[in-house]
Each structure stands twice: as C-alpha cells, then as structure tokens.
Swiss-Prot record:
PANTHER family reported for this sequence: ELONGATION FACTOR P, ELONGATION FACTOR P (EF-P) FAMILY PROTEIN
Organism listed in the record: Syntrophomonas wolfei subsp. wolfei (strain DSM 2245B / Goettingen)
Name of the protein: Elongation factor P
Any one GO CC term of the record: cytoplasm
A GO MF label: translation elongation factor activity
Localization annotation: Cytoplasm
Family, per entry: Belongs to the elongation factor P family.
InterPro entries (UniProt xref): Elong-fact-P_C (IPR015365), NA-bd_OB-fold (IPR012340), Rib_uL2_dom2 (IPR014722), Transl_elong_fac_P/YeiP (IPR020599), Transl_elong_KOW-like (IPR013185), Transl_elong_P/YeiP_cen (IPR001059), Transl_elong_P/YeiP_CS (IPR013852), Transl_elongation_fac_P (IPR011768)
The entry's keywords: Cytoplasm, Elongation factor, Protein biosynthesis
Biochemical pathway: Protein biosynthesis; polypeptide chain elongation
Amino acid sequence: MISVNDFKTGVTIELEGQAFQVVEFMHVKPGKGSAFVRAKLKNVKTGGTVEKTFRGGEKVPRAHLDKREMQYLYNDGEGYVCMDTENYEQISISKESIGEGAKWLMENMILGVLFFQGNIIGVDLPNFVEMLVVDTEPGVKGDTATGAVKNATLESGAVVQVPLFVNTGDRLRIDIRTGEYMERV
C-alpha cells in the first residue's frame, strides 16, 4: 500500500483490478475542508488517461509489475514469438501489445516485456536500432548542401527519411521513439 501523499510521477498503482501509472499529481488544501490529492493516471495496458481525486492520507495498493527481458525470435502470423532470456520459455506476444513498434522488430532483438497479474500489458523496445538500407534512390554528387531528405526502406520494412548521401547497403542508427535517422554506422 502507498499513501496518496507519497505519490510521485511514474509510481504504478492498482485501481479496480487494473494498473495505472501516475502521470501528474497535485496536493490541494482548500481553505475549508480537508486536503485531497488530484492525480492524472495512465492505464498501463490501454494507454488511456483518467483523472481521479483521492482524500488526503488515503492508501491505495501499489501495482506490482514484472519486467522480463525477452529475445524476439520470429513472427508466426498471429503474434510475435519471444524467448525469455532466463528460462528459455517461448511465448507469443499479440500484435496489439507491441503496436506501432512492430515495424522496428528484428530477429534476436532484446525487448523488455511488462507483466501484470501474469498477463502481458506492454513491451519496451530499445531506444535505438541499427538497420540496413535495402532500398533508396541513389544520391547525386553535390546534393548534400541543401539538407534535403529522401525515403529509405530498411530491412524490417520500415520507411524513414534520410539525407541524400545515404545509399542502399548502408547501415543506419535509427531512434525508434521518433522514427528519425541518427547517423550512418
């Protein structure tokens, strides 16, 4: 149990059988009446946010999230098969759990998989990946002065904007949080 007076951004609590992460909170002490805490909570599974008001000193259960390191193996058509790096157990993760991050998955990539009450509620991908460019328009000498960009298709199928000097066969570092080209490797 955690007192609402001890809320900090990032603390995970359990409400109505679901895990919520504290996004914002504010202690309010009105001139008349007792103090209360107004919090903005993000549902860890769905990503939706909700505002909730708690009485001062109220205690709520802390949600115990289990984060396990898993290695992505392959896509079986229904989901993404990953292997636990500790006990080598293989599980299939639904496409909904990975969401938009699926376009960055590569074989043998290490993922952080979040479990709540034995169910997968989220997948943390690494912030940066290194991928090979499989298709892009050839760069023309002297095109680098304008800072122009072109599309490049990566080995995972993702398409990113890259500078004109990048060619097919180059290995790039990509920030997958934003989908932006960082550098040639």
